[in-house]
Amino acid sequence: MKKLVILNACLAMSLATFAQNNADNESKDNSLTKSDSLRMDSIIHALPDVMVKGTRPIVKLKGAALTYDLPQLLKDHPVDNAYEAIKQLPGVTEENDALKLNAQSVTVMIDGKATTMSSEQLYSLLKSIPTNRIANAEVLYNAPARYQVKGQVINLQLKHNQGITALQGEAFGSMKHQSRNRYNERASLLYTNKKWEIDMLYSFSHGKNFYYTDNEFAHNLADGSSYSYVTRSDINGRNLSHNIRLGINYNIAKNHQISLAYTSQLADQKSTAESSGDFESLLKINTKSYLHNFRLDYSTPFGFSAGAEYTYYKSPDEQWVTSSLFDTEESYDITSKQNINTWKVFLKQEHDLGSNWGLNYGANYTTTRDKSSQENTITNQTEDEASLYIGATKNFGTKLMMEASLMEEYYHTTIWHEWNLFPTLSITYLPKAGHIIKMGISSNRNYPSYWSVKNFTTYAFGGYGKIVGNPYLKPSRELDASLTYIYHSQYIASLFMEYDKDGFRQFPYQSSTKKEMEYKFSNCDHIINSGLMLRAPLNVCKWWKNSLTLIGIYQNQKNSHFYDLPFDRSNWYGVAKWNGNFIIGKHLLLNMDGTIHTKAIQGVIDIPTSGYLNAALTWKPLNNDKLQVKAYCNDIFKSTENYLHDTYKGQHVINETHKDRTLGISLTYRFGGYKAKQHEKVDTSRYGI
């Protein structure tokens, strides 16, 4: 969690609104860009499925969900893993190393299972999972309470080989070069018979990385004095990470199953950032992290299911800083540690009441014990969350469907004690074959990371910057609404609105009384994102197939208590995403994809226009697709470089991050008719890892 971006702090904390998509997600391998939140940032109810007719349909309606045929959607796409597969869904983008749906946060689930693991650890696991195990993907813009999560959901459904005795597997290896070399190897095995399904996965990522940043600070004090600093920071990193998973399913009878899963993620990262210019500084960070997750699930053919989950996370790190910023040699040696234990239990029941009515209800309880320390300061935090919900589904003939639910939640910490109601409503209308009109409203609650509410301080930019925690940071309350129209099961238009009361963000602030810059999460009055998403296939001919996604977004962010610089800023920005496939021959495919976004804001930060263009050449020499070789180049024109500016009301902080294009090659071999299986993911979003 505590992978501190010291000399690139402003970059990391400012990408949340809509930083451009790093096409190769290179920052995830870089301990300096994987900062924690503080340190820089089902059973479907028995309603009939309605198939949307049309030419090569990619989506159908199932209950409250839009179900996408991922194997067809991914056809002729050089996608290696589940994370990249999700990014092919309409409206899905990557912002600040996180998946977004219509520029809003989204929860990824597997087989309808809500878990306690997410964020960077989830994405790391997704990248370790082969693509072909996905059967389809459900998209819910306003998830009902029976999913036991709130807000938008992408539910990956798996392929299961129940009743078939088989041993299947896959081996994968890749090398990528972006100034330095990085490598990834993984192996997967799946054994099934009439009663058992045993799934094993191991992946190993290792290598080095390099990039540099140009930083410019101009600081004006209330007494009239002013200071300016211009520096360049060279960042070198090395990382080793292991992902291990073992899943066991036992089929007692049809639709009657007990399953056990163990997930482990181990990482060791070392980073060095050396700055030169108006002052010199040297930063070294050593970080290790250990995550162990156990999950037990039980499901029955009469709609009852229950489960329990335990997650243990530990992350010690040490930071050494030397700096000549204030004309004297200063040094810091900071040791930090985080220990988190999380337990979760849940129950849920679904009934078919007849006459196209359905009823569902359930409960879940999560408790967390967080013992973290920095130097000689130790904090103990307990957090409890309990909820009850009830929901109903109804089919009014064959054209109109409705699902509504209500969840009551109790949230308790040493500071906050709150009861909250979360209503959800989803209405779907089918005017004629091939057309879907879907409307939904829902409410949600977002929680800060565990580390961001600690009263700890960390130094950055050679001692000029201070990253401080906020023990009084409160969860935010979010209201979401959407209206989606699907034409011929391929053309999609979606209006969306998100109103986040008390939404929290991290911004830089240059003090008016002393020579220091402070980073701190604070609650805004509100954060508003609303807009329109359009997606259409543009197939020129049999050998040239395209898709185009356009998103237009209105932003408004207001914070009336941000130090002595209250702000109320608005902005319109657009995103264009193109994907083109060129079928060169029976065994050869060229894929190109590009994205561009216009200027965006995050609080006092301006995020200039940028974009990227990627290309990949895939060769499948065998007719059964058991062997695949892919060569690619991401960010061909090196246009994803970040230029992030804070010049609001006398503030002056400018960061420019420069990375090289990425060249890579990968090889995949499958045996035994291997069909890749997805895994439920452990929610680590609040650990900041």
Please tell me what each predicted stretch does:
Residues N21-L74, E94-N96, A103-S105, G151:
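Short, acidic, small-residue-rich periplasmic hinge/interaction motif at the N-terminus
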Residues L38, D49, A82-A85, L122-S124, ...:
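N-terminal periplasmic accessory domains that precede
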Residues R445-L495, Y499-K501, Y519-S530, A536-N539, ...:
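Outer-membrane beta-barrel signature, preferentially recognizing the C-terminal barrel domain
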Residues I58, Y83-S118:
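Extracytoplasmic beta-strand/coil segments of soluble accessory domains associated
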Residues W196, S241-D268, L282-P423, T428-G434, ...:
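Face-selective signature of the C-terminal outer-membrane beta-barrel domain
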Residues R180-K208, G224-S271, Y290-F294, T300-P301, ...:
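Transmembrane beta-barrel wall of Gram-negative outer-membrane proteins
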Residues Q20-N22, P621-I689:
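C-terminal beta-signal and adjacent terminal beta-strands/loops
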Residues T115-N142:
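Short acidic/polar hinge/loop motifs at secondary-structure boundaries
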